[in-house]
Each structure stands twice: as C-alpha cells, then as structure tokens.
C-alpha cells in the first residue's frame, strides 16, 4: 500500500484497524452489533472533586503557576492494574461534568449519551476521568481565580495558554490518580487537539487517541470567527479592559453576542432550515405596522446567548479562543505534520461529520493522511449527519457504533475488568 498517495473515501477509511470490526468491508449502514443499552441508562448521581496541585506548572508562555486547582469527575472504577483509564478532554465551553447528574440539578453532563454503563465509553469497563482545564471558569484555576500576587481576580492578566499547558496539567492529575498510561485520550473539537497533543508530548502515556471533529490547526475563517466574537466582548462597556469583576460588572451583552456568533457556526444550514426555516415567533411579514418582527431563529439565538452569558466567563472565552487560534500541531516540526506524528506511538481513531463546516471532514482526512504517511495505526470514519459541528455531542447511531466498537476492542485488549481486586 502506498500510504503517501492513497486517497481516503468520503464515507469511511480504516487503516490497520483493530480487528473487532472489519470496516474495510463494511458500510456504516450495515449492522454492527454492540451490547444493547437503554437510552436512559446513566451513571446516576456524581460529585465533582477538586485537586490542589502544589507542584509549579511552567506554561508555554514562560509564566509559572506556583500552584493551581483542577476540578474533575470520575466515572467507573479503576482496575487493579490501573490500565483502564480514559481521559475525556472538553472543548471550548465544556467543563468537567461530562456524565451523570448532580443531586440538586437534573441536567445531565454534556456527553451523557456516550458515557455510562453499556454506552460507547463504557463505565462498566473503563475508569473515565473528565477534568475542567485551567483557564476555564468552572472551579479550576483561571481568570476568575484570585491572583496571589495582587489579591484580586486574575481577569485579563491571566497568562496566555497553549494546548500543551492543558496536557501538562492533566498529566499532574493523572499522576495523582496513580495512572501510568491512559487506555485512551478522547476529545472532540478542541478536545481532539488535546488528544493529538498528548500523543506527541507523552507518547508513552496513552495507548489510543480518539480525535473527533478536530483539526491540526485552525483555518483563517475559524480565526476570523473567533476574533469577531472577542471583539463583541471587548466592545461591551462593562468589559472594563477585562477587569469587570473588580468593578462588580460583567460584559453579558458582549458575551451573549459572541456565543450567538459561535452557535451559528456549530450548526449546519440544513439543520437550521429544518429546525427554524422562516417561521415567525412574533409579528407578521404582511403587517408592516408590527414591530418587531421576530423569527424563530432569532429567538433561539438570543436565548442561547443569554443562557451562556449567565454561566461562562468572558475572559475565559477570550483566553480559550486565542488558545484555539494559536494551536498548530506541527509548527515546531517545520510545519510538517508527518514529522510531528512520527513521535506518536499510540493507535488513532479519527471521526468527522459530513455537515461540519467549522471543522470540516477535510481537516480530519488531513490528520489521517499525515498519520498514514508517518506509518501509524489509524482508523478514519466520516459520519453522515446534518447536525454540523455539534454532531459530536449529539446522538447518532453510526457514531455510537464506530466509537463504541473501537473502545470495546480497546477494553478487550486490556484484559483486567474494571473494579477487579478493588
């Protein structure tokens, strides 16, 4: 096989795939049998944990965090060999709450459909770790935390971050948990970037990387969307040069607008047409005296923006979108992704979605091409979906089969079941 020149079909391509599923001879429309599980299966009530790390963390920008906190959740049990750990890496606005429910909150985690007993990321087989990364705003050290040098919130003074900073912080949590090697590092979007970075920074610390709806670097269009969102935030009078917490303010309108911009890019035109079309919420296009005329899609975006601005921090949004812009997996390898992936030792599963235009399937095929050229074991599946970039978070039978089948084989290779000898 000439890996340099092989073209990847638009629907599915698998190279050196683990032998559980012979997808080279199987269409994703064909049945692939996995254990049945009811749609309402859940790990149940979960409790977040917090780790205070005393070990200094030197960031890529040169700044040293003498200490930092990480909030995380775990699901399932670690086996006696401590070999069944899976790290979940969240995307831009994600957090540690990937699955289950809180005692006082009935809303499930952001990946509830995929994490739990009998689900694709099976907590009967794996010990799953989901962490809120530094720079975010859900309890881990970030812009809303107190700067020990000033006694005030970090705000816009929080140091710039790179994906490798998240990886190094996650590694400290890994050591705290007594895990020497992840069975898999799994993530979508920015989470997939972290999985790839893990494979280069610590190639002996993971057996598999699952990269979903991601890219080796952002396109100019993606960077442009991020800059427009940041400008929306900074244009809010309540932004106060990023020191809004000191003034007991928050740029809610700017952050809501930023989220509205982002949300449009996460959906496909087809889905928006199906969901909203040109339906009106209030007003009448015929009656010119009716003001304002409001389309359903306007109402939806306004709701999403307002909800997001009430729960996320503007400085965190700016910080993490800049981290996305800066991400370039092969930059220190003379911009040669094949040379970059030559350092990886793990197996890869790369997944993309047909209607995703924010992280288009072409980006995933570029990852797969580079991995094949580097001689790595890689499986690639493009999932048919009309859900756009958000498809990686939403139910999809073929997606479940591809992800669940791959991880089922990973579990079989581990041998020792979860909870043995514990």
Q: In which residue ranges do the predicted regions lie?
A:
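N-terminal cap/lid subdomain of alpha/beta-hydrolase-fold enzymes
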Residues: 73-147
């Amino acid at each position: 096989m000439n890996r340099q020149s092989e073209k990847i079909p638009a629907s599915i391509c698998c190279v050196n795939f683990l032998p559980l599923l012979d997808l080279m001879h199987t269409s994703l429309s064909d049945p692939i049998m996995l254990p049945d599980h009811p749609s309402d299966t859940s790990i149940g009530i979960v409790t977040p944990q917090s780790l205070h790390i005393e070990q200094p963390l030197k960031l890529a920008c040169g700044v040293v965090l003498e200490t930092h906190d990480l909030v995380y959740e775990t699901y399932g049990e670690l086996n006696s060999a401590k070999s069944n750990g899976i790290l979940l890496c969240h995307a831009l606005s994600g957090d540690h709450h990937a699955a289950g429910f809180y005692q006082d909150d009935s809303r499930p985690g952001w990946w509830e459909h995929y994490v739990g007993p009998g689900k694709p990321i099976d907590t009967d087989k794996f010990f799953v770790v989901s962490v809120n990364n530094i720079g975010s705003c859900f309890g881990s050290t970030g812009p809303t935390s107190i700067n020990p040098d000033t006694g005030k919130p970090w705000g816009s003074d929080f140091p710039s971050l790179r994906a490798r900073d998240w990886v190094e912080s996650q590694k400290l949590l890994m050591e705290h948990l007594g895990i020497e090697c992840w069975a898999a590092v799994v993530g979508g979007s920015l989470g997939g970037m972290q999985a790839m970075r893990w494979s280069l920074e610590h190639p002996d610390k993971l057996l598999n990387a699952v990269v979903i709806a991601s890219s080796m670097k952002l396109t100019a269009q993606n960077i442009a969307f991020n800059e427009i969102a940041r400008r929306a935030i900074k244009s809010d009078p309540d932004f106060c040069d990023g020191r809004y917490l000191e003034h007991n303010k928050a740029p809610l309108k700017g952050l809501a607008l930023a989220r509205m911009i982002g949300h449009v890019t996460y959906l496909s035109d087809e889905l928006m047409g199906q969901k909203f079309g040109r339906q009106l919420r209030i007003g009448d296009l015929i009656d010119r005296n009716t003001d304002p005329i409001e389309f359903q899609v306007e109402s939806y975006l306004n709701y999403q923006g307002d909800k997001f601005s009430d729960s996320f921090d503007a400085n965190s949004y700016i910080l993490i979108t800049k981290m996305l812009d800066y991400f370039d997996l092969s930059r220190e390898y003379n911009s040669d992704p094949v040379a970059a992936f030559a350092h990886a030792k793990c197996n890869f599963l790369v997944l993309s979605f047909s209607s995703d235009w924010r992280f288009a399937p072409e980006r995933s095929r570029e990852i797969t091409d580079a991995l094949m050229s580097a001689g790595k074991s890689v499986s690639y599946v493009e999932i048919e979906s009309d859900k756009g970039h958000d498809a990686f978070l939403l139910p999809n039978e073929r997606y479940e089969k591809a992800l669940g089948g791959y991880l089922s084989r990973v579990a079989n290779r581990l041998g020792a079941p979860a909870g043995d000898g514990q």
